[in-house]
Amino acid sequence: MHERYVPADVEAAAQGDWRAADAYKTKEDSQKPKFYCVSMLPYPSGKLHMGHVRNYTINDVMYRYLRMNGYNTLMPMGWDAFGMPAENAAMANGVPPAKWTYDNIDYMKGQMQSMGLAIDWSREIATCKPDYYKWNQWLFLKMLEKGIAYKKTGTVNWDPVDQTVLANEQVIDGRGWRSGALVEKREIPMYYLRITQYADELLNDLDGLGWPERVKIMQQNWIGKSFGVNFGFPYELDGEQKLLRVFTTRADTIMGVTFCAIAAEHPLATRLAQDKPELLAFIEECKRGGVAEADVATMEKKGVATGFSVKHPLTGEPVEVWIGNYVLMSYGEGAVMGVPGHDERDFAFAKKYDLPIRQVIASEGQTYSLDAWQEWYGDKETAVCVNSGKYDGLRYAEAVDAVAADLKAGGFGDKQVTWRLRDWGVSRQRYWGTPIPIIHCPSCGDVPVPEQDLPVVLPEDLVPDGSGNPLAKSEAFLNCTCPKCGAAAKRETDTMDTFVDSSWYFSRYTAPDAETMVDARTDYWMPMDQYIGGIEHAILHLLYSRFWTKVMRDLGLVKFGEPAKNLLTQGMVLNETYYREDAAGKKTWYNPLDVTVTHDDKGRPVGATLNADGQPVVLGGIEKMSKSKNNGVDPQLLIDQYGADTARLFTMFAAPPEQQLEWSGAGVEGASRFLRRVWSFGYGNREALAARAGFDAATLGDADKALRREIYSVLKQADFDYQRLQYNTVVSAAMKMLNAIDGAKGATPAVLRETYGVLLRVLYPVVPHVTFELWKTLGYADEFGALLDAPWPKVDEAALEQAEIELVLQVNGKVRGALKVAKDASRDAIEAAAVADEAFAKFSDGKPAKKIVVVPGRLVNIVV
């Protein structure tokens, strides 16, 4: 054993032992309770960041603690390897996305291995490998058979210069991110999955999940179950009687309708624009810019009057129809009723275009004014109908019922439940993704690829150039024969949304070598007992994976309907930021390692200079580590300097897992110093610790009893904290243990060995390398087996027993000392000891005790 703790040597030795023993390869075992813990698989971007380190360490700590407690634990890893960043990198570097992706996987896998993670690498998957995405294609075809997958036209962002479809995030201020061209909206055929068919189940099943309430609320809002009324405004056009249908949750305000707005893509807008160039021009303008709902919510609301009116279904009054750029064809009916008196967006629109505003609800004590919008105008809790004829005086629920009944009686509509959730469009006009297994035949139309011909393999040697999908130019991929008639045909060149890849990978981990999508092993491991990932995945990934799981269940592939019982959303890792701003307002950000900070006498930062030139930089505050703010810390540099155990210890100690973690160089140094103390104690007491002498607890001296009492008392709390995932206080407990052991005077070697062994096991899940080596070197492995599977230490309840207890001694309510009495001392004995104590004699001024108050186990107060 070396005197000095050298992390690189210790970690290399431990990892060598683990590799030799294939320590983390896991099999099903019906004799043990199972625990399946999964970190959301990473995108292979090139390097791990500190957020990865924190996530995977949390998972690893959980794995190791539960394995020591007798669980059959599994921690797999894979790569979410398809996606747009690989295409962008390919264009920038002139290499195929496949090469960029596989190179990154190799590097990041090496980084993970250097962290000492308990990953079963035999289960590794990469979603860009044909043996994985074959099953994306297979399940897609099954969903097509069941009508869950279907094809319809959808609106996309089109870059007219690059001749390609853009994702919403590639549209910046209405322009293509590469070309700078004004983006257009285009309608193209795409495949969708009927997630709306599962809306009720997705909503209701949230109640049974051990997920953060915040995440469940986000999903509830995204699913967006609404109770309202679907009805139509009648009109006549081209000799036909029709209804302009809308949905509203505020039917109580129907008498306040002064206009209707329709989407630019609405069939009525198309018809009305046939002979009106100004309408056609506005429709074309609406087609430029992004199609994201968020873009629509923040952009300037514009409209144009069509000169056409529909009729109010209850009054028969004409209602003017406008085309509005804020109305989305993909939501609701593509039309909305305009109630400017009681909807903030409609109010602003009406003020802009001088449309009538009508008050039809009122709240007691409030005065309505057209001058400016007030929050209560949209209130439905306390409001009653006014200026609404027969509905006057009705409150919200009563008014909705009455209006719905009248609309139904008139044949215009009825109550309806609607959902904010929309079917999942899975077609992407991109190369680096799962090919959609469809063949286009001139005679047979769209033909599914036969199951025996799966997978449709994506060529990995193409290099995107930004001008359209490379698959459309690859004759080898594109040309095929129709499986129905044998004629020459073309393959579908769209690929699947990468959220498909991440919707079921955790099930494939359980049976990575299966010749079917999943097998019986999947029902052994799934659902995940613990899923770990960032809050940014609260909606799309987690919702899609829940939907995908339910589809797999309904197809008879699995027996469970939810992918994860419990979810932990770890907090972000934050760091200081520093920048300079030029005359044009552009900020240049500097890494904290390149900056020297000055502090005041209270340790608060008051200034900073750039090391390169000694000139000032601005303190930007603490923000999430990111490339854009250049405030990241390279985990590899940290591991190279301090070792993986120090990185792990700091990330677990600095904050509870679910809270934000503020980076601290001093905190990292403190973690390293603590591990050196653990090692130093082991080295300095190696002979005493290695001696396997037993002891009789009943005959131990006071020093031994006190040490055991302290260690087992702290162990009790540490065990509880492990169970509730409060790993920061587990580390605090270990620090208390080391202080107690290191400071124990007169403790025997046997008790030191026992208590130090407890410390090593408590620390092991957090810092596995140093504890593993100390455990082996000091002979614990010979007695208990390798630390990987050593039994978790049990609290010796007898050691917690005390013959004497200490009570606070007060005189007239003020603390004057401490009183030691027998644990089972009677009240009379406690009172006698109190008045006999020196503290009473000193602070009672010779006065006798009038009253003695005894609070059992806590204090004695003598009143004089």
Curated annotation (Swiss-Prot):
<dbReference type="GO" id="GO:0005524">
    <property type="term" value="F:ATP binding"/>
</dbReference>
<dbReference type="Pfam" id="PF08264">
    <property type="entry name" value="Anticodon_1"/>
</dbReference>
<feature type="short sequence motif" description="'HIGH' region">
    <location>
        <begin position="42"/>
        <end position="52"/>
    </location>
</feature>
<dbReference type="InterPro" id="IPR002300">
    <property type="entry name" value="aa-tRNA-synth_Ia"/>
</dbReference>
<dbReference type="Pfam" id="PF00133">
    <property type="entry name" value="tRNA-synt_1"/>
</dbReference>
<feature type="binding site">
    <location>
        <position position="627"/>
    </location>
    <ligand>
        <name>ATP</name>
    </ligand>
</feature>
<dbReference type="InterPro" id="IPR009080">
    <property type="entry name" value="tRNAsynth_Ia_anticodon-bd"/>
</dbReference>
<feature type="short sequence motif" description="'KMSKS' region">
    <location>
        <begin position="624"/>
        <end position="628"/>
    </location>
</feature>
<dbReference type="InterPro" id="IPR002302">
    <property type="entry name" value="Leu-tRNA-ligase"/>
</dbReference>
<dbReference type="InterPro" id="IPR025709">
    <property type="entry name" value="Leu_tRNA-synth_edit"/>
</dbReference>
<dbReference type="GO" id="GO:0005829">
    <property type="term" value="C:cytosol"/>
</dbReference>
<dbReference type="GO" id="GO:0002161">
    <property type="term" value="F:aminoacyl-tRNA deacylase activity"/>
</dbReference>
<keyword id="KW-0547">Nucleotide-binding</keyword>
<dbReference type="GO" id="GO:0004823">
    <property type="term" value="F:leucine-tRNA ligase activity"/>
</dbReference>
<comment type="similarity">
    <text>Belongs to the class-I aminoacyl-tRNA synthetase family.</text>
</comment>
<keyword id="KW-0648">Protein biosynthesis</keyword>
<dbReference type="InterPro" id="IPR009008">
    <property type="entry name" value="Val/Leu/Ile-tRNA-synth_edit"/>
</dbReference>
<protein>
    <recommendedName>
        <fullName>Leucine--tRNA ligase</fullName>
        <ecNumber>6.1.1.4</ecNumber>
    </recommendedName>
</protein>
<dbReference type="InterPro" id="IPR015413">
    <property type="entry name" value="Methionyl/Leucyl_tRNA_Synth"/>
</dbReference>
<dbReference type="GO" id="GO:0006429">
    <property type="term" value="P:leucyl-tRNA aminoacylation"/>
</dbReference>
<keyword id="KW-0030">Aminoacyl-tRNA synthetase</keyword>
<dbReference type="Pfam" id="PF13603">
    <property type="entry name" value="tRNA-synt_1_2"/>
</dbReference>
<dbReference type="InterPro" id="IPR013155">
    <property type="entry name" value="M/V/L/I-tRNA-synth_anticd-bd"/>
</dbReference>
<dbReference type="InterPro" id="IPR001412">
    <property type="entry name" value="aa-tRNA-synth_I_CS"/>
</dbReference>
<dbReference type="InterPro" id="IPR014729">
    <property type="entry name" value="Rossmann-like_a/b/a_fold"/>
</dbReference>
<keyword id="KW-0436">Ligase</keyword>
<keyword id="KW-0067">ATP-binding</keyword>
<keyword id="KW-0963">Cytoplasm</keyword>
<dbReference type="Pfam" id="PF09334">
    <property type="entry name" value="tRNA-synt_1g"/>
</dbReference>
